[in-house]
Regions:
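Core beta-strand elements of the Rossmann-like FAD/NAD(P) dinucleotide-binding domain
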Residues: 8-10, 154-163, 235-236
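N-terminal Rossmann-like FAD-binding beta1-loop-alpha1 element of flavoenzymes
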Residues: 10-37, 409, 413-414
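Short hydrophobic core segments
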Residues: 13-15, 38, 139, 159-175, ...
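Glycine-rich FAD pyrophosphate-binding loop
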Residues: 29-53
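An anion/pyrophosphate-binding glycine-rich loop and adjacent beta-alpha core
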Residues: 42-44, 49-50, 58, 64-65, ...
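Glycine-rich active-site loop/strand segments that organize a redox cofactor
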Residues: 55-103
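A glycine-rich dinucleotide-binding beta-alpha-beta segment and adjacent secondary-structure elements
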Residues: 135-138, 311-391
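A conserved short coil-to-beta-strand element within the FAD-binding core of flavoproteins
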Residues: 135-148
Length: 425
């Protein structure tokens, strides 16, 4: 049978100028393909600029196998992609294109500049060096015939292509242009979409205590996520933030990924003093009380707790805020200690998917070839990044997935060979 090896002359359209899309476009072009990158915002990498609080957690300084341990959804699907482009490979790539990197706590890798713009600059340099054409276009439809993709339709007209790589933004952070178009485009060609929900997302409290402490950030605290059966499904140590609706911050975002779909009754339990066991904490409280014997209880905790937290802890302890410290009983002191060591926040639900850093759900991975990222339903159609039903915890793992799947999709599309038309007759 005659084959038409396009040998790098494939015309490839990449839809979506985020992390995965830029990597896919650059890699395909570097392999010799003619690549057009379509980004409806006109400016690629908009969401990338706000990741990691504007610093961009590029990857994690770990073995690629350890990345899989931080992927709760479909980790086996990523085996080939990560084996081919590890965190070490990602670091080398960005260093090569002028973005110096450093590793911090938890092996999180950031640009030395502490600016996400440095990461974006490296990617843009990569695109320019490999002559990727960037166009500000919104794709309205994928064109296909005979089980093979033939291009895309945009609001400005059709663009023919041998291969199309879908790497669109998902539903999170709509202000950056993420509208979930990729789900619609993939579904129109027969792909199953696993319902998107927030994965790394803030949590909404049932009561109002968090709102009373809005803006308070706590560092070096221990967190446990407990389900309705009382089982601890996640625990970690780090930083959280009280908001007007509930809880946010790194440990909370990671905890949210462990909340099963459709399950209610979760509680976040916070140890406000994890470095102190109960005996040591009790001794600390006694020392503070000794120094404030004649004060009202509400005026005795400033050395132990943040100011905005004191009224909430007092209310939960059941101790009268105006009770004199020298009259507080051992049982009351015990109630205070238990409140500090297990500050519970019943969770009503996750915040809306629009508030999520990462979305769980997307194109069903059993319909995608894990070794190439090509659709099993439509020849010449590829997927990369968050559009796929894979997600990971915080720590640079989600961007590592974007780099790895984008690279694999780009190289696979550039190397794609098609049967010549006459063989079909």
């Amino acid at each position: 049978m005659n084959m038409t090896p396009l040998n790098g002359s494939n015309k490839i359209v990449v839809v979506g100028g985020g992390a995965a899309g830029m990597m896919a476009a650059g890699m395909a072009a570097q392999a010799g393909a003619h690549v057009t990158l379509l980004e409806q915002n006109g400016r690629p990498g908009k969401k990338l600029l706000i990741t990691g609080k504007g610093r961009c957690n590029v990857t994690n300084d770990c073995a690629w196998q350890d990345v899989l341990l931080n992927v709760p959804t479909n980790p086996r699907f990523l085996y080939s992609a990560l084996a081919g482009f590890s965190p070490a490979d990602a670091r080398a790539f960005f260093e090569q294109y002028g973005c110096a990197l450093k590793a911090e706590r938890g092996n999180r890798v950031f640009p030395v500049s502490d600016r996400s713009q440095s990461v974006l600059d490296a990617l843009v340099r990569f695109l320019h060096e490999n002559h990727v054409q960037l166009l500000p276009r919104r794709v309205t439809e994928l064109a296909a015939a005979g089980g093979r993709v033939t291009g895309v339709k945009t609001e400005s007209g059709p663009i023919p292509a041998d291969c199309v790589i879908l790497a669109t933004g998902v539903l999170s952070y709509p202000a950056t242009g993420s509208a979930g178009d990729g789900y619609r485009l993939a579904a129109a060609l027969g792909h199953t979409i696993v319902e998107p929900v927030g994965s790394l997302v803030p949590l909404v409290e049932k009561g109002h205590d968090c709102a009373r402490m809005q803006g308070l950030a706590l560092k070096n605290i221990a967190v446990r996520l407990v389900n309705a059966k009382g089982k601890t499904v996640y625990e970690d140590f780090g930083e959280l933030l009280f908001t007007h609706f509930g809880l946010s911050g790194p440990v909370i975002l990671s905890a949210s990924a462990h909340m099963a779909r459709g399950e209610d009754g979760y509680t976040v339990r916070i140890d406000l003093k994890p470095a102190l066991d109960e005996k040591t904490l009790d001794a600390r409280i006694l020392r503070d009380f000794s120094a404030a014997q004649n004060r009202d209880f509400e005026n005795s905790l400033s050395a132990l707790l943040p100011r905005s937290m004191i009224p909430v802890v007092i209310a939960r302890s059941g101790i009268d805020p105006l009770q004199k410290v020298n009259s507080i009983t051992k049982q009351q002191r015990r109630a205070l200690l238990e409140t500090i060591k297990c500050f519970s926040v019943p969770i009503a639900c996750k915040a809306p998917v629009e508030d999520a850093i990462v979305t769980s759900g997307g194109v069903k991975v059993s319909e995608v070839n894990a070794k190439t990222m090509e659709s099993k339903r439509v020849q010449g159609l590829y997927f990369a990044g968050e559009l796929l039903d894979v997600d990971a915890y915080t720590g640079g793992f989600n961007l590592q997935i974007a780099w790895a799947t984008g690279r694999l999709a780009g190289l696979s599309a550039a190397a794609k060979e098609f049967s010549s038309p006459e063989d079909a007759t």
